[in-house]
Amino acid sequence: MSQTKGRVTIPTNLDVVPETIELMKRWGADAIRDCDGTEFPEELTKTGAKIYATYYTTRKDNEWAKANPDEVQQCYVMTAFYTAVDKELSIPLMKGISDELMMVNTRDDIKRWWEVIDRSTGEIVPTTNWNYQEETGCVVICDAVPFHEYTVSFLAYIIWDPVHMYNAVTNEWKDFEHQITFDVRQPKTHKYSLERLRKYCEEHPYVNVIRYTTFFHQFTLMFDELKREKYVDWYGYSASVSPYILEQFEKEVGYPFRPEYIIDQGYYNNQYRVPSKEFKDFQAFQRREVAKLAKEMVDITHECGKEAMMFLGDHWIGTEPFMEEFATIGLDAVVGSVGNGSTLRLISDIKGVKYTEGRFLPYFFPDTFHENGDPVKEAKENWITARRAILRKPIDRIGYGGYLKLTLDFPEFLQYVEDVCNEFRELYENAKGTTPYCVKKVAVLNSWGKIRSWGCHMVHHALYQKQNYSYAGIIEALSGAPFDVCFISFDDILQNPHILKDIDVIINVGDGDTAHTGGSIWENPKISSAIREFVYNGGGFIGVGEPSGHQFQGHFLQLADLIGVEKETGFTLNYDKYNWEEHHDHFILADTTKPVDFGEGKKSMYAYAGTEILVQREKEVQMAVNEFGKGRSVYISGLPYSFENSRILYRSILWSAHGEAVLNQWFSTNFNVEVHAYVKNGKFCVVNNTYEPQKTTIYRGDGSSFELEMAPNEIKWYMI
């Protein structure tokens, strides 16, 4: 008998007390939370439910922020590129940036912490050759080289918390005060924040869980003068800086800091950039310092008899949950927003906490809950997409956020959430405490490794980008597939070549000369030799997009010999190419029902002699396979997430690992239906991922099979 209560968190507000109690019963919620812009009703403190209180370590105390303007949080910003036409060039610092969001920091030594760069040469402009005119807000370069480009990198105070600004703009809030972001890392605010936290805990005895949002630096989020989003990087570190922090960094690493280590030519070290040594040093420093201070807060929380939960997002930069420092914080739980399977695994794969929680969509905001809105559609898509990943690695709880009042006019939505809550509880009871059956071990190889586990190709949280959906689809497919998935970096291979011995298949996915494929790391023969040796001795390799892409020593794809495919960059147009014959009857394509969707695909890819082309379009290879020694490789130009493409990736992994013989084990012949086996628990489930009825043949672990018809979205549980 499945549980009918528990493992669910519900939001509330002062104006929905009876409705909260009613929905707690319907949804089986055992925890209640507040949200940004809401207050917790006293009446609900006596319900017996666990009470979460959202706690902002860096805002919601403007009195302190205004009294200590020197300890307001800061961000490194680079101006646009400006071309000099004569010896003098004036560059406006705040052009394109909301002056409600940021204010130029002139309090600290600008000649020490700012940087003017000649972008035509990459050279630093001497500090004697420029000055800042505060009345105009411009840096004036007095000895510019005509027709060279210049930029200014400067520090700015974050005078309106970016998340508060986003919430205010999205919800059209009126008559409110902008919340200023203060820096808990700095001495006065550090001391004050610990006292403030202890006082809060003492004044809120009814609160069981402090839901920290978060520790302590906002991911990079900038808005322009029209309050439109200008720049976003969910992993961005550029708002985790101050002279105080940077001086500490200098002492630790033993070399002087440069703004360019953060600015990175205006790319701000986004995850497509191959990270520099200096940036990796800075990340490591931030991880240690953030963990140290976060632990102080968690210790106070525990002393006050409460649990400490961290929200995975907003001011989370430096926590890095997949790195060793995270466990030292001592958190009880992590909660994060679930946008798809990948972002579910971002939460559920975190170690070092007692439980994890996923906040599901839609968020109860007016952008979804309005007269013509369809929250049921969004909720269905969110649940069905995330469910695949939950079945591989369950979170321990689910919840929702926002304004509960908005949902009350949508009875179908309330019913659907009730169904989801019941289904989740059943799923959790059946899957908990065991690792589901894994066919093979797969390693995603890039410059970042485990620090960006499940977040590869993600610019903003789970949002579509035309330029990367063909690659992000690989990660999404893996999030719910029966593989043991790990994320390794090129540095990992250099430090420990034996790391590949436990792996069946390596996947390298992305555009050339990005961190996802490696860039100039391929000039190091230790890397290319290690991968070749791995495959030659029987390993599998799957390359998607421009794997190992970097022009060097006669190749663009540095593993072209292994992959059997190369890119025509123009340098080899003089060579004729004769291998264009397609082989559609391959194991990998056996379940396809239509032409393969490669998303954006890739132009100008051709195959070497001996390579077996599975799909080429207008003499551009989209999919090919190759034998290399005892091993095998698969090339795919792109693979957006879909159920059919998920099956293609599944078969690609099996084929590259010589695993064709294990295909019919815990397997569904219909790719819209998937099988997950929990052998230790003696159970397996079959899940219909679509909104239509499905028919399929299900294979058990011993190869025996049975026919099955399934209702839309249905999940069926069986004993092994």
Residue ranges and their predicted role:
Residues T9-I10, D15-K50, R196-T213, F326, ...:
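Catalytic domains of carbohydrate-active enzymes, especially glycoside hydrolases
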Residues L221-D224, Y231, K405-V439, S479, ...:
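Extracellular ligand-binding/catalytic regions of CAZymes and related secreted enzymes
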Residues P69-T328, L346, K432:
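Polysaccharide-binding and catalytic clefts of secreted carbohydrate-active enzymes
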Residues L44, N62-A65, L197-R198, N208-F215, ...:
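Hydrophobic targeting/anchoring helices
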Residues M1-L23, W27-D30, W160, H164-K174, ...:
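Boundary/entry segment of secreted carbohydrate-active catalytic domains
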Residues L494-K501, E523:
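Short amphipathic alpha-helix with an adjacent loop that forms part of the alpha/beta core around
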Residues A462-F487:
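Short helix-loop-beta junction
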Residues G518-K594:
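A glycine-rich, often tryptophan-bearing local segment used as a flexible ligand/cofactor-contacting loop or short
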